[in-house]
């Protein structure tokens, strides 16, 4: 994979990471100061694990 392809892939990973961040923020804002319910907590855990996977992919892509 050349550097241009890596850059495109990295950009795609960043966009996906940002989208997941937005989804997490939306869930937290739904609670609006109230404790998150179990479904919300599980959903956030799932989204956070997806974010971690994207970070692993980005690091692997950059050879870290």
Predicted regions and their residues:
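Charged, low-complexity interaction regions
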Residues: 29-39
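Alpha-helical transition-metal enzyme core signature, strongest for iron centers
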Residues: 20, 47-52
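N-terminal acidic leader/helix
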Residues: 1-30, 56-63
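Short, charged, amphipathic alpha-helical segments
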Residues: 10-14, 37-49
């Amino acid at each position: 994979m050349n550097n241009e392809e890596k850059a495109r892939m990295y950009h795609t990973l960043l966009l996906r990471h940002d989208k997941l961040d937005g989804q997490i923020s939306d869930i937290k804002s739904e609670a609006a100061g109230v404790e998150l319910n179990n479904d919300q907590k599980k959903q956030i855990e799932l989204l956070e694990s997806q974010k971690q996977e994207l970070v692993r992919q980005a690091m692997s892509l950059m050879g870290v």
